A protein has these predicted regions:
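Long, contiguous N-terminal structural blocks used for assembly/anchoring
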Residues: 1-71
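Amphipathic protein-protein interaction modules
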Residues: 42-121
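C-terminal edge-of-domain segments
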Residues: 125-126
Length: 127
């Protein structure tokens, strides 16, 4: 259904955009990519096939130019922002039904979907 690799890629992009120290341009090593991919797979498993289908078919949700029509890009972005407590993310997506926004927010805020970024010598690691 939804591609966890794209979710992981945009999860990392959102992490770098939102939380990298000002004026730096850190990169994500393979270890970070693998952790983000596992998180994306776990998140997709948690939301289930019915919710995945809803997100995939909701063209308004993936309308932002950065998403290029892919719900996975929006999910990765929203998963990072929601799980890190940025006050934005799934709840801001008016294209999603209120029940879906609340369900996804509740999941994203659970401990198993919250990875902490650590920036060290130009690299971002997820713990």
């Amino acid at each position: 259904m939804l591609d966890p690799k794209i979710i992981a890629q945009h999860y990392i992009i959102a992490a770098l955009w939102a939380d990298a120290p000002e004026g730096t341009r850190p990169r994500a090593p393979r270890e970070t990519e693998e952790k983000a991919l596992q998180l994306a797979r776990d998140f997709l498993r948690a939301i289930g096939p019915k919710c995945q289908e809803y997100l995939k078919n909701n063209t308004e949700y993936s309308k932002h130019p950065d998403c290029r029509g892919r719900a996975e890009a929006a999910i990765g972005h929203d998963l990072w922002l929601t799980s890190q407590g940025h006050g934005t993310g799934f709840l801001d997506r008016r294209a999603l039904h209120e029940d879906v926004r609340e369900f996804l927010t509740g999941l994203a805020q659970r401990k198993e979907f919250t990875l902490c970024p650590e920036f060290y010598r130009g690299w971002m690691y997820l713990q």
